[in-house]
């Protein structure tokens, strides 16, 4: 295997990521290997390791593409409406995205780095960027000085919505309810935000003293 190089390093990186993404979309993470990527792009397996640190690095960059695609979709939904309307649109877009890209989205939670390996800062920034979308939608419910409470509320909402979408994409939602995922998400958002607006949630609690954590993608 192998061919004379006709691509720039950046083009070759994109070829590798395109091939890896296609493999994951069809076969899932279990089907991904350096050998299969190399076969598809018609380069030697060693070429992959010249472009990326290892296969985990390749996977992280595919995950980054997924996060960027979701962020691009969410970024168009914050222009109009009140907090409940905006958060509901974000949540419904999240649900739709997971159903449209089930294997790519599951990749974010199936892929584990070796013990003791931290997520790179550039990856953490992409996660924070997604959380910032939810925080922006919640902003009208939190006065100045409640930024950490707003961060916490965004993560509570994300965890709840993600739970519903996970059951839905796994076809397990019917085990606990006959309601649709879309209806459950709307109820979750409306109920939680009504509590915040009435002073029964994070907006009324004492200011948080510790930094609110980013929801973990890697367990």
Predicted regions and their residues:
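N-terminal intrinsically disordered/low-complexity leader segments
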Residues: 1-11, 200-219
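An amphipathic alpha-helix adjacent to DNA-recognition modules
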Residues: 10-21, 25, 30-31, 42, ...
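Append "Primarily bacterial transcriptional regulators
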Residues: 32-39, 48
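Hydrophobic/aromatic residues within well-ordered alpha-helical segments
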Residues: 62, 66, 70, 94, ...
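Hydrophobic alpha-helical connector segments
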Residues: 75-104, 128, 144-147, 153-157
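Amphipathic C-terminal alpha-helical segment
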Residues: 100, 157-176, 191-202
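Short linear capping/connector segments at secondary-structure termini
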Residues: 108-117, 173-175
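Amphipathic alpha-helical packing segments from all-alpha helical-bundle domains
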Residues: 117-142, 151-155, 183-194
């Amino acid at each position: 295997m192998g061919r004379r190089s006709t691509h720039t390093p950046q083009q070759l990186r994109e070829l590798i990521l395109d091939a890896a993404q296609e493999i994951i979309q069809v076969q899932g993470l279990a089907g991904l290997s350096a050998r299969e990527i190399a076969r598809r792009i018609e380069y030697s397996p060693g070429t992959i390791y010249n472009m990326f640190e290892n296969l985990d690095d390749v996977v992280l960059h595919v995950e980054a593409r997924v996060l960027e695609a979701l962020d691009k979709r969410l970024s168009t939904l914050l222009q109009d409406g009140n907090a409940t309307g905006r958060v509901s649109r974000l949540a419904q877009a999240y649900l739709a995205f997971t159903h449209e890209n089930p294997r790519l989205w599951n990749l974010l939670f199936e892929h584990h780095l070796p013990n003791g390996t931290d997520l790179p800062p550039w990856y953490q920034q992409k996660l924070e960027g997604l959380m910032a979308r939810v925080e922006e939608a919640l902003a009208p419910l939190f006065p100045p000085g409640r930024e950490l409470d707003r961060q916490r509320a965004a993560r509570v909402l994300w965890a709840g919505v993600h739970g519903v979408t996970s059951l839905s994409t796994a076809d397990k939602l019917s085990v606990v309810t006959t309601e649709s995922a879309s209806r459950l998400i709307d109820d979750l958002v409306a109920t939680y935000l009504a509590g915040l607006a009435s002073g029964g949630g994070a907006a009324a609690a004492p200011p948080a003293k510790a930094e609110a954590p980013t929801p973990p993608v890697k367990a």
